[in-house]
Amino acid sequence: MNPSTAQATAVVDELVRGGVREVVLCPGSRNAPLAFALQAADLDGRLRLHMRIDERTAGFLALGLAIAGKRPVPIVMTSGTAVANLGPAVLEANYARVPLVVLSANRPYEMLGTGANQTVEQLGLFGSQVRATISLGLAEDDSTQNSQWRSAVCRVLAAARGTRSGNAGPVHFDIPLREPLVPDVHVHGPVPEGRPGGAAWTTTQNATLDVPVDLDLTADTVVISGHGSALRPELAGLPTVAEPTAPMHGIALHPLALSQLKPKQAIITGRPTLHRQVSKVLADPSVDVYALTTGPRWPDVSGNVLATGTRAVVTGTPDPAWIARCAALTEHAETAVRKQLDAHPKATGLHVAAAVMDALADGDQLLLGASNPVRDAALVSYPKPAVRVLSNRGVAGIDGTVSAAVGAALAYEGGRTVALMGDLTFLHDASGLLIGTGEPRPSDLTIVVANDDGGGIFELLEQGDPQYAGVFERVFGTPHGMDLAALCAAYRVPHAAVTVDALATTLAQPANGIRVLEVATDRSGLRELHASVRAQL
């Protein structure tokens, strides 16, 4: 076989040997050798291939597949702007530590700077946002290159998984390909072989880091369980403010209850991304703050952390009076939220979040959009223990949420997937609904859109203060007036407009593929609703 075909065949084979099971491919000419090899592997049942025409959407599809499947997922594209469109997904994968592999085809490097069409300096395009930038040299008619190709693939996967660094994340794998870009009509020459028995060319053991931190639990302690945290059994029994995507280590502590407490000690696990009340506690110089994290990132936004480590060595027991007070304040906060929801005259995103959280069953997978939905979910209730919760909290952008939900649903075989997002988030990534004929489709994905015709989160921020009412609606509210039913019809995705009261009943019915449930909400009273909740505390 010709050199480019041989190289692509070896790369795809080694990806499969290294544990890759899902690959997203965008059509192009320069990446044709990879496309042929991927299609062959898909037909052989060695991996599942997903075709997408938009690289930005494809990147977030791969992100969702990687998060839910807990495996590296390559996204393969041609050269030029196709690679640049992966920027947002790479940023999210970097800060969320998701093993995304950007596998870009390139022109032969001698074409750079010559004015050759669709040729850009794409090597190094992602800079510090990737764990590694790895390039293969041009393939030659030389069988000894097989070991170099396969070794490079193993290096890519190790960097993406963080097996040597403890820091998983995106990797840019760039492959220059010379013509011919299609397989020979009459195959000749040896097929590049891998290790016997389907083994990876190079195996890498996970690096381990054990840094104990001594903690005395007799002090009044709260735990802040942030995104990316692992379960910490040593913290069981402690009041815990857990983000929806994070494990509940101990006794649930409502985030609004923090304003009524004066803890002496706070323990961070993972990376907190929500709640101003949490930020205030962690920045309070009278609170001793400790951080339990893995990976190289510094886990201290406020500069107030006393010590960091990977696990706690605990002594002492919590004061029962402190535990009882935290439990009582949590119950009071939960009651206040639900009471004010019942009293509020109009449906809001908070009402939709409450209906969704209440309707979830064991085995469900929930994907929460950024902006208000993830915050609303945190305020109304903590997810049931057997519900799997995902969200793009790396850089907490709204982009790519529909595509990530599709990817997460495709990778999850344990039950149904429900995605909750706002209307701007849905519109921003509506092209994520475009799935080609014959492509793998989720079997049970419901996208719930809380449609308040604009940016509801700004109603709750400083910009939403009545003194700025004259400019607020156009530049922050951003009403769009879009017909979501017509938009869904264009993508041939079933759509239904439902009320908050009917949402639970509708969610109980199977999606039978992908469906969109639109709930009309009002954002004009959001500021008043949240103020009324706080007034009850």
Curated annotation (Swiss-Prot):
InterPro entries given in the database record: MenaQ_synth_MenD, THDP-binding, Thiamin_PyroP_enz_TPP-bd_dom, TPP_enzyme_TPP-bd
EC numbers, comma separated: 2.2.1.9
Coiled coil (residue ranges): none
Keywords: Magnesium, Manganese, Menaquinone biosynthesis, Metal-binding, Thiamine pyrophosphate, Transferase
Gene3D superfamilies referenced in this protein's UniProt entry, alphabetically: 3.40.50.970
Catalytic activity as recorded in UniProt: isochorismate + 2-oxoglutarate + H(+) = 5-enolpyruvoyl-6-hydroxy-2-succinyl-cyclohex-3-ene-1-carboxylate + CO2
Cofactor(s) listed: Mg(2+); Mn(2+); thiamine diphosphate
GO biological process: menaquinone biosynthetic process
Pathway(s) where this gene product acts: Quinol/quinone metabolism; 1,4-dihydroxy-2-naphthoate biosynthesis; 1,4-dihydroxy-2-naphthoate from chorismate: step 2/7; Quinol/quinone metabolism; menaquinone biosynthesis
Entry's cofactor comment: Binds 1 thiamine pyrophosphate per subunit.
GO molecular function, one term: thiamine pyrophosphate binding
Top-level taxon: Bacteria
Family the entry assigns: Belongs to the TPP enzyme family. MenD subfamily.
HAMAP family linked: MenD
PANTHER family listed in its UniProt record: 2-SUCCINYL-5-ENOLPYRUVYL-6-HYDROXY-3-CYCLOHEXENE-1-CARBOXYLATE SYNTHASE (PTHR42916), PROTEIN PHYLLO, CHLOROPLASTIC (PTHR42916:SF1)
Protein's job: Catalyzes the thiamine diphosphate-dependent decarboxylation of 2-oxoglutarate and the subsequent addition of the resulting succinic semialdehyde-thiamine pyrophosphate anion to isochorismate to yield 2-succinyl-5-enolpyruvyl-6-hydroxy-3-cyclohexene-1-carboxylate (SEPHCHC).
Oligomer status and interactors: Homodimer.
Listed name of the protein: 2-succinyl-5-enolpyruvyl-6-hydroxy-3-cyclohexene-1-carboxylate synthase
Gene encoding the protein: menD
